[in-house]
């Protein structure tokens, strides 16, 4: 895992130490070894806390989960997100970021933004500025868009999430794959990727 500061220095996820050593030494970067048993224990505590807030939860990875907030009014959903974040911090001591949206892909966009926000919670429910927000999200930061797909999109003048959202279904079907179609639909607020509980 990398801190925001390490990312800003250009240290890539998964880079071996020897590749980043010059940057690490030059900038006084601190490197820590992994403690997977501790991470696993902390992850279980966070996921258990999340289950307190809803019955439908998808544990996506050791440090990510999707929670179904159906039934929470649009007006209260961000406040509910803050309650979840504060409870996790109180019960586990772990600061989190929470992204709330109508689809999994948009919730990942919201979470991407929340990581930089002081409150740590961002809701894209009823956001009128969705195109402005998506325009600021680089195509390689869109959930499900890997390196090969990023190259393909950039070659086809699609460099941000707004452009992918607005691409025609005909173009996607002709030029890409079903995953691209789902991602574009999700960016439009149409849920195509269901919760896996």
What are these regions (language model features)?
Residues 67-72:
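Short beta-strand-to-loop capping motifs
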Residues 76-140:
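Long, highly charged, low-complexity intrinsically disordered interaction regions
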